[in-house]
C-alpha cells in the first residue's frame, strides 16, 4: 500500500508528487495519457510568462523541468490508465480502480485531473486517420516544421488564430477556414493575423482530403462553402485542425466516493484543497476554493498544499508543512553537485 495515489500527471499532480516525496511519502502517479504533462502538452510552443521567478520561456521547456522535478523521488508511475472509481474502505485505506480492472491501494488520494481527460476533436472526414502521423496535426509541437510551407488551419477560435499568427511569420502562406460568418477568437487577434496576410475564409469547411500517390500525406484539400455548397481544391503542405476539445470528467460523477462539487464541474475545496471526504484532496484546475486562481503557479501551490494535508492525515503528529528545500537534508548531496557546477 502506498501512502498516496495521485490521479493526474499535469503540473499540479507532478508538483504534488514532488512535494509528497519531499515529505517522505511513497507515491503512485496515474495518468490516462501516454505522457506526463497534462494540458501543457497542448501548447508546447507558447511562451509562459506568469510563473514567479521563472523567465519567459516556451511551455515545453517548463514542462520538461516540471516532469523531472515530479519524478525526483521516484514515484510509481502508471500511464495509459483511466481511473474509474475511488473507494474509501476505511480511514487511511483507499482503493483506486482503473478501466482495465487494476486496483491500487493507498492511505490517501490526491485528485489532479485538471478539467478532465482532454482530447482534441477529430476532423470528421473519411480516411483522415491515414494522415495523422504525417502532415495532419491537432497540436502544434514546433513552429519550425512549417517554415516556407503552405499551411491550412481549420477553426476560428483563439487557438486557431494564435497558431495562424505565429506560423504566418515563417510559413509561405497561411489560410484559415471556419464555418461561421466571423471568427470567434479575439477581434484584436483577427486584426493581427490579417496584417500578416493570413487568408481568412468564412463559411468554409474541409470536405475532402486528397492524398499523394501512396496515400501517406495530404497533397490537396477540397474546401466547401457551407451555404452554397460550392467547392474548390487547394494544394497545402500541412493541415492543422483546431476544433476544440472533448472533455471527459465522468470519474467525479461515477465514483463511489461522492464529493461535494462546485457548479457540477469542479471539486469543492473547503478553504484549500481539502474535500468533503477526509483523505481525498484535490489540486489544480479541478478544485475550486475561495483563494483559487487558474495559473500554473497556483497549481504548484495547490499540489504542495494537498501533499501537506495528505501527510498529516496519514500521520497526525507530522508537521503541518515540510522544511524549506534550501535547508532540507534530502538535497544535501545534490546541492554539493550544483554548488560545484556553479563555482568551478
Curated annotation (Swiss-Prot):
Co-factor note (free text): Binds 1 FAD per subunit.
Assembly behavior: Homodimer.
Entry-linked PANTHER family: THIOREDOXIN REDUCTASE 1-RELATED-RELATED (PTHR48105)
Positions bound to FAD: 12, 31, 39, 43, 83, 118, 285, 326
Catalytic function, reaction form: 2 reduced [2Fe-2S]-[ferredoxin] + NADP(+) + H(+) = 2 oxidized [2Fe-2S]-[ferredoxin] + NADPH
Pfam families recorded: Pyr_redox_2
Cofactor(s) of this protein: FAD
Molecular function terms, GO-annotated: ferredoxin-NADP+ reductase activity; flavin adenine dinucleotide binding; NADP binding
Signal peptide: none
Claim: Flavoprotein is one of the keywords in the record: yes
Domain of life: Bacteria
Family membership noted in the UniProt record: Belongs to the ferredoxin--NADP reductase type 2 family.
Organism: Staphylococcus aureus (strain MSSA476)
Database matches in SUPFAM superfamilies: FAD/NAD(P)-binding domain
Name of the molecule in the record: Ferredoxin--NADP reductase
Keywords (A to Z) from UniProt: FAD, Flavoprotein, NADP, Oxidoreductase
EC number(s) on file: 1.18.1.2
Amino acid at each position: 500500500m502506498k501512502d498516496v495515489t495521485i490521479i493526474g500527471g499535469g503540473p499540479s499532480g507532478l508538483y504534488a508528487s514532488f512535494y509528497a516525496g519531499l515529505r517522505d511519502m511513497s507515491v503512485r502517479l496515474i495518468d490516462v495519457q501516454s505522457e506526463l504533462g497534462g494540458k501543457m502538452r497542448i501548447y508546447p510552443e507558447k511562451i509562459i510568462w506568469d510563473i514567479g521567478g521563472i523567465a519567459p520561456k516556451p511551455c515545453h521547456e517548463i514542462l520538461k523541468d516540471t516532469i523531472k522535478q515530479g519524478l525526483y523521488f521516484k514515484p510509481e508511475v502508471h500511464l495509459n490508465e483511466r481511473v474509474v472509481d475511488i473507494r474509501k474502505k476505511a480511514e487511511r485505506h483507499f482503493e483506486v480502480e482503473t478501466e482495465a480492472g487494476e486496483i491500487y491501494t493507498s492511505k490517501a488520494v490526491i485528485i489532479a485531473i485538471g478539467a478532465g481527460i482532454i482530447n482534441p476533436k477529430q476532423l470528421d472526414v473519411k480516411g483522415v486517420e491515414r494522415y495523422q502521423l504525417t502532415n495532419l496535426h491537432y497540436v502544434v509541437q514546433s513552429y519550425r516544421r512549417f517554415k516556407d510551407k503552405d499551411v491550412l488551419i481549420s477553426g476560428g477560435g483563439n487557438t486557431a488564430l494564435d497558431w495562424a499568427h505565429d506560423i504566418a511569420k515563417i510559413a509561405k502562406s497561411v489560410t484559415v477556414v471556419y464555418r461561421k460568418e466571423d471568427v470567434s477568437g479575439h477581434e484584436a487577434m483577427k486584426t493581427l493575423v490579417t496584417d500578416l496576410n493570413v487568408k481568412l475564409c468564412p463559411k468554409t469547411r474541409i470536405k475532402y482530403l486528397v492524398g499523394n500517390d501512396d496515400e501517406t500525406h495530404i497533397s490537396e484539400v477540397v474546401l466547401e462553402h457551407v451555404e452554397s455548397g460550392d467547392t474548390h481544391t487547394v494544394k497545402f503542405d500541412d493541415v492543422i485542425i483546431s476544433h476544440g476539445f472533448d472533455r471527459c470528467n465522468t470519474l467525479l460523477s461515477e465514483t463511489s466516493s461522492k464529493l461535494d462539487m462546485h457548479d457540477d464541474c469542479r471539486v469543492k475545496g473547503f478553504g484549500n484543497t481539502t474535500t468533503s471526504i477526509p483523505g481525498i484532496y484535490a489540486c489544480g484546475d479541478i478544485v475550486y476554493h475561495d483563494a483559487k486562481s487558474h495559473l500554473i503557479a497556483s497549481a504548484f501551490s495547490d499540489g504542495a498544499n494537498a501533499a501537506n494535508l495528505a501527510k498529516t492525515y496519514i500521520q497526525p503528529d507530522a508537521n503541518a508543512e515540510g522544511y524549506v528545500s534550501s535547508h532540507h537534508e534530502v538535497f544535501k548531496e545534490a546541492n554539493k553537485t550544483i554548488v560545484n557546477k556553479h563555482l568551478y
